[in-house]
A protein has these predicted regions:
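Structural signature of the two symmetry-related core transmembrane helices
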Residues: 82-97, 297-312
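Helix-loop boundary and gating motifs at the non-cytosolic
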Residues: 3-60, 232-264, 268-271
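Intracellular juxtamembrane helix-capping segments at the cytosolic ends
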Residues: 120-134, 335-349
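C-terminal membrane-cytosol helix-exit motif in multi-pass small-molecule transporters
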Residues: 156-168, 186-205
Length: 357
């Protein structure tokens, strides 16, 4: 198996670099800005954390309901690119507008919209893996996607960090600094979306029906009825639902949790920057291991590691402990996400990848 990426594989990986800027912002700067907005309007510290977690949970629920429908619709011929581009652009547009709301509630509504659009774009994006590479290359390409996503997102993040941490020395308000950060990351997201949109062609698809929207529900029902015939797929989905929720909870809530404990803001942001840097070689290591080790076994190792990380996080109340958490998460975050994506892509029907993802 050749190691060099094809042009299409590289352009697919570019989207990981683009959208990762948004999710890094969500995990770092965004909770701090929401804390600033809510506290300035009299929201108690413990309520700030609750509202933030409610918003994250609600966005997850919306995606859980809309994702299967949108993914199934994307499997029809020439639908995948259109749906992907729409979701990505809506997410980037919402991100660019984050600085506008002065109300913490309006900000949360916009955040939910952006998070939902981002997550729906990922469903379609992940399903493209079957179109852009071969089965034997899926583990390596998926892992490299996450690896370059982590390191690529560091560029707009560092620039944003300079403005957010030094806005007063630059003679600007925090809101102006945030505006620059949000727009910069939105432009970055769009810029790394366009190469894939330009070159991607849907290789596996289902021929359009007379009423694709209505037939989407019929296909979903038919797939669920065949669950017993696809035990491997649905057993993995059942396990994935639980373990990936734990992974994303740690990613999404780390900064908000640290802020609520009163840990130093600059230290939190730099620690999470370290997570991205550590995740780059760690994800590439998983790509190398996947060539000689069973993918399912590597996923199990990462799950056990995350379980231990979560146990450590329960008692976390010191700055240095947060740094240990950041490094530990970086070691396994990319591996568990990348290999889960590629493993699932291998065991599902190629022409129904959107529906299954």
């Amino acid at each position: 198996m050749k190691n060099k990426l094809t042009k299409l594989e590289f352009k697919w990986i570019c989207y990981d670099m683009g959208n990762s800027a948004f999710i890094l912002l969500v995990a770092t700067i965004l909770p701090i800005y929401f804390n600033y907005l809510s506290s300035s309007q009299g929201v108690a510290e413990h309520n700030y954390l609750s509202y933030w977690s409610y918003a994250a949970s609600l966005s997850t629920l919306i995606v859980a309901l809309a994702g299967p429908i949108l993914g199934t619709l994307a499997d029809y011929k020439d639908h995948k690119k259109k749906i992907f581009l729409t979701c990505a652009m809506l997410g980037a547009l919402a991100l660019a507008c984050f600085w506008i709301p002065s109300s913490w509630f309006a900000f949360l509504v916009l955040f939910i919209a952006a998070k939902v659009a981002y997550s729906l774009s990922l469903i379609v994006y992940d399903s493209m893996l079957t179109d852009i590479t071969t089965e034997e290359r899926m583990d390596a390409v998926s892992s490299k996607g996450y690896a370059w996503g982590y390191i690529g997102s560091v560029v707009p993040f560092i620039i944003s960090l300079v403005f957010v941490l030094m806005y007063d020395k630059m003679g600007m308000t925090l809101k102006t600094a945030m505006m620059i950060a949000f727009i910069l990351n939105a432009v970055w997201w769009i810029a790394f979306t366009l190469p894939l949109v330009k070159s991607y062609k849907q290789k596996y698809y289902i021929e359009p029906e007379a009423h694709p929207a209505l037939d989407t529900f019929a296909r979903l029902k038919d797939t669920l009825m065949k669950a017993k015939e696809q035990k491997k797929v649905f057993l993995f989905l059942f396990a994935f639902f639980f373990y990936i929720d734990g992974v994303y909870t740690i990613i999404d809530m780390a900064t908000a949790y640290g802020t609520s404990l009163g840990l130093n803001t600059t230290g939190l942001l730099l620690a999470l920057l370290l997570t991205q840097i550590v995740a780059f070689p760690a994800s590439l290591t998983f790509a190398v291991l996947s060539k000689t080790k069973d993918t399912a076994s590597l996923i199990k190792v990462a799950i056990i590691a995350y379980f231990l990380i979560a146990l450590f996080a329960v008692q976390l109340d010191k700055q240095w402990e947060f740094w240990i958490l950041a490094v530990a998460v970086g070691c396994f975050q990319g591996g568990i996400q990348a290999l889960s994506r590629s493993y699932f892509a291998k065991i599902i029907p190629e022409n129904a990848s959107g529906e299954y993802f």
